């Protein structure tokens, strides 16, 4: 595809989203952004490749939503408010219908989550989407993976396992009921970045991250960064009732512990902040479950309903 055809893309991406602080956005060599005093800039980037992170024939609107949301999840994990993002788009061909659907979905989500596209790049090649998100957090208030202490309580938002279960959508040998298929499709392409929850946890959580690589792996990151371990209560893991009916208990446990792609927040809470977190949960301000505690020993121990440590095979995150 001749590269000059990419001039058509300006029509679709020149005005996506609105946010304060954009002094100069799409159309120049770079964006000029105003960072308010007393705020830190949080920056994260993820790349999605067709055939690796989503099916090559996925609908463009689905791709757009997934690409932006998985990036925004990183901002949520740091307690940041989304402001701006850039887009690097590699396309195998200039399909105007594809671009229209992709840009409309991207614009809708940018509006929903309060961020603006401020720049990017386009080129020809295999379908690849790279999005860099930028957000703001008050100085000294960012949530990070470092800071957990022995005895801290481990929590996770929402429910787990649905992101990994969604891979069944792309297995032709698996038959799924229509309602289940729609739930899994929504979970895969439209994960909800826990931005509101991230803001609520500022000043209360000692460490946090989003569950993208699997609960065991991601909780392991918190433990490693703090030179600690954790005891994980298997019976406390939050699983949607409908998901439990989708496969045998062992498979569901594998989805929950190792599957990844859930984009929930895993966070630790010191004992002195536990009452505040419990109050938010009881009051409906936060949907989260206590699933264990940090320990002075290294490694993650999985504890069954009888209080016994059990060996759990960690299969690890699987790409599409």
Describe the function of each predicted region.
Residues 29, 152, 262-265:
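Short, surface-exposed beta-edge/turn micro-motifs
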Residues 20-22, 31, 107, 118-122, ...:
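A generic local secondary-structure boundary/capping motif
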Residues 75-84, 114-124:
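Short, flexible active-site-proximal loops enriched in glycine and acidic residues
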Residues 1-59, 78, 83, 87:
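Extreme N-terminal cap/leader segments of soluble proteins
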Residues 1-15, 39, 59, 92-116, ...:
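Glycine-/charge-enriched secondary-structure boundary and capping motifs
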Residues 63-75, 105-106:
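Short, well-ordered amphipathic alpha-helical segments that serve as non-catalytic structural scaffolds
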Residues 42-45, 143-199:
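Short, acidic (Asp/Glu-rich) active-site segment that either coordinates a divalent metal cofactor
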């Amino acid at each position: 595809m001749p590269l000059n055809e990419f001039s058509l893309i300006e029509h679709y991406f020149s005005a996506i989203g609105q946010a304060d602080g954009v002094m100069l956005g799409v159309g120049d060599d770079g964006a000029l952004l105003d960072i308010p005093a007393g705020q830190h800039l949080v920056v994260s980037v993820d790349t999605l490749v067709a055939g690796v992170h989503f099916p090559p024939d996925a609908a463009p609107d689905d791709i757009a939503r997934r690409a932006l949301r998985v990036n925004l999840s990183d901002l949520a994990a740091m307690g940041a408010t989304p402001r701006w993002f850039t887009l690097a788009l590699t396309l195998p061909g200039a399909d105007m219908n594809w671009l229209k659907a992709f840009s409309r979905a991207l614009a809708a989500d940018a509006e929903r989550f309060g961020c603006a596209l401020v720049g990017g790049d386009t080129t020809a090649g295999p379908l690849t989407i790279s999005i860099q998100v930028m957000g703001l957090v008050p100085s000294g208030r960012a949530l990070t993976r470092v800071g957990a202490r022995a005895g801290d309580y481990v929590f996770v938002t929402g429910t787990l396992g649905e992101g990994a279960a969604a891979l069944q959508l792309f297995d032709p040998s698996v038959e799924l009921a229509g309602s289940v298929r729609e739930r899994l499709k929504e979970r895969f392409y439209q994960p909800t970045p826990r931005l509101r929850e991230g803001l609520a946890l500022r000043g209360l959580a000692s460490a946090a991250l989003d569950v993208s690589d699997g609960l065991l792996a991601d909780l392991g990151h918190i433990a490693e960064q703090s030179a600690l371990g954790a005891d994980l209560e298997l019976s406390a893991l939050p699983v949607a009732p409908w998901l439990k009916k989708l496969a045998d208990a062992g498979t569901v446990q594998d989805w929950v512990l190792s599957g990844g792609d859930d984009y929930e927040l895993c966070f630790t809470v010191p004992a002195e902040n536990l009452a505040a977190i419990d109050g938010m949960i009881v009051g409906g301000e936060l949907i989260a479950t206590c699933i264990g505690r940090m320990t002075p020993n290294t490694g993650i121990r999985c504890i069954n309903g009888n209080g016994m440590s059990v060996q759990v095979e960690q299969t690890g995150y699987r790409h599409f």
